Amino acid sequence: MVARVGATAMTLPTAYEEDAWTGVRWRIRGRTFAHVLVAQEGYLSSYREATGIAVPTTVLTFRSEGEELLALTRAGHPFYKPPWSPTAMGMVLEEATDWAEVAELVTDSYRFCAPQKLVRLLDRSGPSPVER
């Protein structure tokens, strides 16, 4: 699942991947726009509480805003609203995950976090190979 998210994230201008405090995250100029981890017992209980799932679960967190954030917040599973940031959104990754939707959400999150110069560069280059 990490590789599938990374396949989109690494096509975005100057994005880079790094190990996070847990899991893997993708960043643009020091801002995290996507983070994949396994929510499990212990110090990650806040993820379990946010998802409502007690077993170890792979999750993606990303940034969203406006109408999209509102729609995702109301959508229910596989989406959940983490409490730690007003723009943070989460998605449980599982067998039935719509990977085209993940690519779109990761790209939108990048647009939210990236400087406008890079967003314009992305707009000129068109959709990522994953979105085509």
Where do the language-model regions lie?
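Charge-dense, helix-prone N-terminal extensions
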Residues: M1-R132
